[in-house]
Amino acid sequence: MSASSITGDFQDFLKHGLPAIAPAPGSETPHSPKLEEKHREKRAGLPDRHRRPIPARSRLVMLPKVETEASGLVRSHGEQGQMPENMQVSQFKMVNYSYDEDLEELCPVCGDKVSGYHYGLLTCESCKGFFKRTVQNQKRYTCIENQNCQIDKTQRKRCPYCRFKKCIDVGMKLEAVRADRMRGGRNKFGPMYKRDRALKQQKKALIRANGLKLEAMSQVIQAMPSDLTSAIQNIHSASKGLPLSHVALPPTDYDRSPFVTSPISMTMPPHGSLHGYQPYGHFPNRAIKSEYPDPYSSSPESMMGYSYMDGYQTSSPASIPHLILELLKCEPDEPQVQAKIMAYLQQEQNNRNRQEKLSAFGLLCKMADQTLFSIVEWARSSIFFRELKVDDQMKLLQNCWSELLILDHIYRQVAHGKEGTIFLVTGEHVDYSSIISNTEVAFNNLLSLAQELVVRLRSLQFDQREFVCLKFLVLFSSDVKNLENFQLVEGVQEQVNAALLDYTLCNYPQQTEKFGQLLLRLPEIRAISKQAEDYLYYKHVNGDVPYNNLLIEMLHAKRA
C-alpha cells in the first residue's frame, strides 16, 4: 500500500466521517496595550472569536517540547522483521517554560495598580479609601445618568454612585470595614487573604521554575518469540453473549478499507464555540469568597461505572475553568462506544468457525483498532480541531494517534481499573497475571510500563478534567511541522495549559506540584507509544496484524 493511497483515504475519512460511529444522542478582562501589541502577531491566525486580548496570565505555560531519538526498525513489507536484542528507549528532555514577567495585578474597580488586600480582595489605594469613607460615613450617592457610568482610572471620581456599586459588584465587603474608624480590617478575613496569597505564590513559583527535568528513562525490550503461542484467559468472554438490542448502528466493516466511507456520512452534534471564553487569568481580579472549600471536598473522585462522564458535575462549576467545561462536552458517549466495540467483536467471532477463535493478540488489536476509530471521530468533532483544514488535521492525528490510544488506556485503568486486573474498552476486567503469563516479553514490558504510569497518576488523583486537557495537549502539538495554521495550534495549546494550571491550583491546592507532575507524564506516554508502534510494526511484518485496519494505515502513514 502506497503512502499516497493512505493519505488520500485518510483525507476522505476526515472530510466525511464513518457510518460505523453513531452520533451521540442530543447532546472584561483588563489588559495592557503593550501586552496586546506583543501578542497580536501570534494570534493573527486565530478565528475572530478567539482574537481576544490575551493577558500575560493566559500565556504562562507552554507545553514542554520533547526531544526524542526514535530507534526505528529498518524493514520493508517483504521482510520478516527481527526485533533488536536490546532496543533502548531514548532519553527525553524538557525545555524550560516561557514566562511573561508582567504579572502586575490591576484593581477590579478602576484598573489602577493594586496595593494589597482591602475589604475582601486586591484593590488600589484609591478605591480602598473611597470604599472605607463611604461605609464609615454612611454616605448616600445618586447617579445623574443611567446608573451604568464607566469606571476607570481616568474617571473614577466622576460618579461615586456607580463607583461604589462596582465596588460591591466585584466583591468588596461592607462587613470588613471597621465601624469604629480605627485602622485595619476585621481579623476574620486574614485566613482568606493568606489562602489566596498562597495560591498566587504557588502559581508564580510553578511559572518561574527553571523548567521541569525528566530523568533519563531506560527500558530494554528483550528479543521476542516468533509468534503468540497462548491465549489470554477469560479475554474471549468479551466476544460472547453480547446484547445487540441497544446498538444503534452496525460496527465498522473490515471487508473494506477503514478509510472508505459511504455516501451517508456520520454527522456530529455541534458544540458551541467559545464565544464567551475569556483567556485564562483565573486568579487575578477574583473576589475572595468568605468561605473556602476543603482542599479535596470539591475535587473529582474516582468514578464508578463505565462512563467517563460519571461524576462530571461533582465539582462546583465555579471551580472548573470554562474552557475545560467546553472540552468535556466533546467527550464521546462511552457506553455507546463500548456497545459498538462489543457488537463488532461478536460479529467477528460469529463469522469464524466455532473452533477458530481470535488469538489473544488479534482480539486486542481489534479492540485497539475500534478504539482508534472513536478517537479520530472525537477529534473531528472537537472544538478548535474542526476549524483546521483537513491537511492540518491529518498531520496532527498522524503525529499522536498512538499517544492518544495509550492515554485512553491509562485513564481507563485510573478511573475504572481494579487491583490486579486490566480494564478493557469493552468493560471487561481481565486478570493481569494471566496476561503476563501468556504474552511475549516485549508486550509484557509495555504493559508493565503502562501500569507503572497508572500507579503514579492514581497517586496524583488524576481526574477526568485533567484527562481531557492532556488529550488536547497531545493532539495540538506544536512539534508538528509544516502546519498551515500553526498559530491556532499553538494558541490552543497555551490556553489549555493555562486552564489546566488554574484548575489544579483551585481544586488541589495542597498538591502544589500537580500541574508539573501531570506535564511530566506526557513524555512518558510518548515513550510507551513509540515502543508500542515498533512492536506493532514487528508483529505486522511477521504477518500477525492484517493490512485492512486503521492501526496499520496510521502506522504506515506516520512512517512514510
UniProtKB/Swiss-Prot annotation:
Record field: compositional bias (Basic and acidic residues): 31-48
Record key words, sorted: Activator, Chromosome, Developmental protein, DNA-binding, Isopeptide bond, Lipid-binding, Metal-binding, Nucleus, Receptor, Transcription, Transcription regulation, Ubl conjugation, Zinc, Zinc-finger
C-terminal extension (CTE): annotated span: 173-188
Biological processes, Gene Ontology terms: acinar cell differentiation; bile acid metabolic process; calcineurin-mediated signaling; cartilage development; cellular response to leukemia inhibitory factor; cholesterol homeostasis; chromatin remodeling; embryonic cleavage
Residue range(s) of DNA binding per entry: 104-179
InterPro entries (alphabetical): NHR-like_dom_sf, NR5-like, Nucl_hrmn_rcpt_lig-bd, Nuclear_hrmn_rcpt, Znf_hrmn_rcpt, Znf_NHR/GATA
Post-translation changes: Sumoylated by SUMO1 at Lys-289 during the hepatic acute phase response, leading to promote interaction with GPS2 and prevent N-Cor corepressor complex dissociation.
A molecular function GO annotation: nuclear receptor activity
Protein residues bound to Zn(2+) 1: 107, 110, 124, 127
Position(s), cross-link Glycyl lysine isopeptide (Lys-Gly) (interchain with G-Cter in SUMO1): 289
Binding site for Zn(2+) 2: 143, 149, 159, 162
Motif (FTZ-F1 box): 189-208
Tagged with keyword Nucleus: yes
Subcellular location: Nucleus; Chromosome
Domain notes: The C-terminal extension (CTE) loop competes with a DNA minor groove anchor of the nucleosome and releases entry-exit site DNA, thereby promoting opening of closed chromatin.
Family annotation (PANTHER family): NUCLEAR RECEPTOR SUBFAMILY 5 GROUP A (PTHR24086), NUCLEAR RECEPTOR SUBFAMILY 5 GROUP A MEMBER 2 (PTHR24086:SF18)
UniProt record similarity statement: Belongs to the nuclear hormone receptor family. NR5 subfamily.
Listed name of the protein: Nuclear receptor subfamily 5 group A member 2
This protein's encoding gene: Nr5a2
